[in-house]
UniProtKB/Swiss-Prot annotation:
Pfam families: Pkinase (PF00069). This is Serine/threonine-protein kinase mos. Residues 71-340 form the Protein kinase domain. Belongs to the protein kinase superfamily. Ser/Thr protein kinase family.
Amino acid sequence: MPCDTADNWARYEGQDNAIMVARRGSVNSAFVTNSSQYHQAEDTNGNCFINARNDNWDNRDCNACVGHSDFSIDGVIGSGGFGSVFLGRYCGRRVAVKSVRQCSRNKEASRQSFQAEFNALLLRHDNIVSVLATTAYEDFDSGAFIIMEYAGRNLQQIVNDPGSSLSPTRRTKYALHIIRALHYTHSQGIAHLDVKPANVIVDSNTDVCRLADFGCSQRVSEGEGRDSFTSRSYLTGTFAYRAPELLRGRPPTTKADIYSYGVTLWQMLTRETPFAGENHHVVIFGVVAQNLRPSLPENANDAWYESLVTRCWEGRVADRPSAAEILLALERRTDDTENLPRDLKRRHGTT
């Protein structure tokens, strides 16, 4: 089923944005014009955003929007708040297929989650799991599915596996991969809003991390006095990773992702679950009113990494570094282990 209208892309449309869907042969390609959020329709390699990666992948018979008969489901990989993920096949390749759960109490939340994943078709980056296709938005009531590249197990599974090493070198590498994904996403004006180990896929062949699950993502506007593109407070991620300003009901910014990123880094360091066994309401009150954070280990012997963690989960939005600042520090870290604390000196700005 081809994706023929711009209505399906309404979440990314604005007065100055025009998003068009065109066809090249039998491949649907998305072009974004006059957009302040998407400056070009091609990535740095000259590939159209909507095209699948070219690693032995034949696009010729694949569409951005598909019917239920165009893919198959073979087995369950896992499940989450808004659906289950299955192993499947699409265009002759093994893929991950996410089924969006239709919540009877809040159907609009399910629809918006699917719409956010649909819009992720536009995102193309080596550290982001590619969304290859979706069922059409108009077919939501008969079953909503998102088809993604299959990469491997998630970071949460690695954290939970005592046989999997998370050495300082590997932690740093994973931290770099994740922040590259966030830097790209934020540069497109989008906050992920559900950054956590379960949403980071680690390629079993290359050991490269890729950010997944954009079901909570929102286009945001940074700056004082400017609200987010749309208010969806019930789609702001998992509470233990949620930034305090979101717990207060404030509009999200990209700095909310930095807070969640900090908790994710903490989890790689400790291999523990944040606030495990604690009452949710007590934790939320503690995070918001008392600056409660997960406990750092006393003998981790990784001061620079702990410095990064604590800077990322600062209570004030303005005190957290940006993804660009963290990316620069981590890239320099590979050459000079003394750079990180200096590069992440406290910066004050606009909340």
